[in-house]
Amino acid sequence: MAAVKLEKEVWSSRFAFLMASVGFAVGLGNIWRFPYVAGENGGGAFVVVYLICVLVIGVPVLMAELLIGRRGQSSPPIAVTNIAKENGKSERWKSVGGLGLLAAYTIEIIYSVIVGWVLWYLFKAVTTGFDGVDATIANANFEGMLRDSSIMITATFIGLAITGSVIYAGVQSGIEKAVRFMMPLLFLLLIGLATYNYFTASFYEAMSWLFTPDFSKIDGSTLLAAIGQAFFSIGVAMGGMMAYGAYLPRSVSIGRSAFIIVSADTVVAILAGLVIFPAVFKYGL
């Protein structure tokens, strides 16, 4: 296979690239997994271990993926192939990029369903609201949604259609326009909800559960959990950062960008804990 170079648009600005990259990194690993894993593995002690793993492992891997994408100037498998051929190495290295895409595809199968859940709950919030809904009713409503195949299929299809339309529009007309609106909105929502929780009694209970250090829980399994969380949360090893790197102008610093992406990703994870767990303790979920 001949080396392929993409003739394409690039990110219009460093800010647009950072917003898109943070948007790719932020996901279930931040919103759901990080607060729970931190609380179960020593609270503040786990956070320290996690931050070390992010700086020592996560940032270098992220930099490598962005560099491969920018230098290879193509999709992950072809970008890896281009670089391998430039250095006289086997084209079999393209399997590295292919495995990343396979991982992304597998995760997308899960995410597309969850996006459908979110759209359904957004519809319910606008039409009927959730006044008077306690933990028992909320659980029954959720199980009812899962049993209704028409809701699940329709909501998932709508989510995929929205995502597909954004991607089809391209980098500047699609992804950039979406993230310029959605990412600041995400941060505003998280900050607003965390501020609201600050004035509830359960906020301090959640803070204690999340951040009080318990170094007695730090062992080999905790280290593995921190490394796994770093990879899952930042979004490396899934091909996405390579793909975004392919559209990255050479004037943009990869090292500085990687540090900003990881920092923003970590802030979202911490804010998510301050949003979710005060409600968990308050309502006994």
Feature map (PLM): residue ranges:
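Membrane-interface "cap" regions at the ends of multi-pass membrane proteins
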Residues: 1-32, 61-66, 70-98, 249-253
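Membrane-embedded translocation segments of transport machinery
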Residues: 2-7, 11, 176, 180-285
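Inter-helical loop and helix-membrane interface segments of multi-pass membrane transporters/permeases
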Residues: 5-9, 37-41, 71-99, 112-172, ...
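Hydrophobic alpha-helical transmembrane segments of multi-pass small-molecule transporters/permeases
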Residues: 17-24, 50-55, 97-108, 160-161, ...
